[in-house]
Amino acid sequence: SGEGEIPTDKMTYRTSPTTGDRVSLLGYGCMRWPLKPSPDGNGEVIDQDAVNGLVDYAIAHGVNYFDTSPAYVQGFSEKATGIALSRHPRDKYFIATKLSNFSPDTWSREASLRMYHKSFTELQVDYIDYMLLHGIGMGGMDALKGRYLDNGMLDFLIKEREAGRIRNLGFSYHGDIEVYDYLLSRHDEIKWDFVQIQLNYVDWKHAKETNTRNTDAEYLYGELAKRGIPSIIMEPLLGGRLSKLNDNLVARLKQRRPE
């Protein structure tokens, strides 16, 4: 166990250096909730009973961090996640969600505020534990300015943190490294509570081989460590691809370690 780890028989926890939150090392991504045929036969809808069961199982086994977004599961992830989690005491889980105003028609302050306030309604909460600017770097500096800077939304989110409606403010990163570096350069002013990056054994030094827009996690993590900003990891298995090795790679690994 490293510094800040609390081993238990079910889960390892990390204590946030900024808030003291005791967060499970394994979080639950709510981007792909199970679906079932729609009652009217037109497409699919979220299987709420299945979601409830998955959330119950996760909490029973020590998971207490749930990551969602207004953009996930055709816009219905937050509602399904809120229904499932609201059946548990509020102090038993942390909710992470995002201001996912990707489309230019949601860049206005009014549209962004509607999205932000809707998250509270859908999640059935009066505060959000971890709020992220979603996917900064996608669209470069122009998108960052349109989504968060020119409309005053970053300043608004900082004030919401001061008011206690946001407990931790951070961002998730894909794409243009200029945007990542710019936001970190403002850390002394903004005081980022955490940053979410893509990190796994491929992306550590070979990120561009899986996606040319990405930057090696070694650099991303290093920049956070230099500033003492806690990191949250997404895609530890590269969207599941690292859990399904092809026969050639399995053979090579077995040559190295037959056991």
Residues of each region from the PLM?
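Structural preference for beta-strand elements that scaffold enzyme active sites
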Residues: 15, 23-27, 64-65, 92-96, ...
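Active-site groove signature of glycoside hydrolases
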Residues: 120-145
